[in-house]
From Swiss-Prot:
It comes from Xenopus tropicalis. Its main location: endoplasmic reticulum. It comes from the Eukaryota. InterPro entries: UPF0729_C18orf32-like (IPR026776). Keywords: Endoplasmic reticulum, Lipid droplet. Residues 1-37 are annotated as: Necessary for its localzation to the endoplasmic reticulum and lipid droplets. The lineage of its organism: Eukaryota, Metazoa, Chordata, Craniata, Vertebrata. Coiled coil: none annotated. Residues 46-82 are annotated as: Disordered. Residues 54-69 have a biased composition (Polar residues). Belongs to the UPF0729 family. GO terms for cellular component: endoplasmic reticulum; lipid droplet. It is found in: Endoplasmic reticulum; Lipid droplet. This is UPF0729 protein C18orf32 homolog.
Length: 82
């Protein structure tokens, strides 16, 4: 069974978001703007943007490639013959 708060809390949040917030928000908004008047923090470093790429990873010479830590050729074991 699902506990009662697990059902009641999401329903109450939905009711608030759907019906109460449009009524209450215009009254609360000026108060919130006085408390938090600052804008969002902007990223100041442009070097971070230069380091970003299109999702490819630039591997260095010491990185692990394809899950293999060893260097050079690996010995491939022969198949078992009966």
């Amino acid at each position: 069974m699902v506990c009662i708060p697990c059902i009641v809390i999401p329903v109450l949040l939905w009711v608030y978001k759907k019906f109460l917030e449009p009524i209450v928000y215009p009254f609360i908004s000026p108060i919130i703007n006085r408390i938090w008047p600052r804008k969002a923090v902007q990223s100041a470093s442009t070097s971070a943007k230069k380091e970003e790429s299109n999702g490819t990873c630039k591997a260095s010479g010491t990185s692990i490639t394809n899950g293999s830590v060893s260097r050079g050729e690996e010995a491939v074991p022969d198949k078992k013959t009966d």
